[in-house]
Amino acid sequence: MAEIKKGSLVRVVREKLENSLEAKASDNRFPAYIFESQGEIVDTRGDYAFIKFGKVPTPNIWLRLDQLEKFE
């Protein structure tokens, strides 16, 4: 797998996000755009990345790096 780092374009892997601790801790009805469109990693801290989805005004989100994959 290619390295995911600051500036990488990514998408969220649905199977890895659903039923995760993050999904259980908040509303688990995630918007489709996080799975279908590209987001840019703005920052990383430990095992987490801060992701910005830029086509429409949406809130940025912290997710685990293992829940992301390079956007192709």
Swiss-Prot record:
Keywords: Membrane, NAD, NADP, Plastoquinone, Quinone, Thylakoid, Translocase, Transport. It is found in: Cellular thylakoid membrane. It is an enzyme of class 7 (translocase). One of its GO terms (cellular component) is plasma membrane-derived thylakoid membrane. Its main location: membrane. Its EC number is 7.1.1.-. It is a peripheral membrane protein. It catalyses: a plastoquinone + NADH + (n+1) H(+)(in) = a plastoquinol + NAD(+) + n H(+)(out); a plastoquinone + NADPH + (n+1) H(+)(in) = a plastoquinol + NADP(+) + n H(+)(out). One of its GO terms (molecular function) is oxidoreductase activity, acting on NAD(P)H, quinone or similar compound as acceptor. It holds the Pfam family NdhO. NDH-1 shuttles electrons from an unknown electron donor, via FMN and iron-sulfur (Fe-S) centers, to quinones in the respiratory and/or the photosynthetic chain. The immediate electron acceptor for the enzyme in this species is believed to be plastoquinone. Couples the redox reaction to proton translocation, and thus conserves the redox energy in a proton gradient. Cyanobacterial NDH-1 also plays a role in inorganic carbon-concentration. Belongs to the complex I NdhO subunit family. NDH-1 can be composed of about 15 different subunits; different subcomplexes with different compositions have been identified which probably have different functions. This is NAD(P)H-quinone oxidoreductase subunit O. It comes from Trichodesmium erythraeum (strain IMS101).
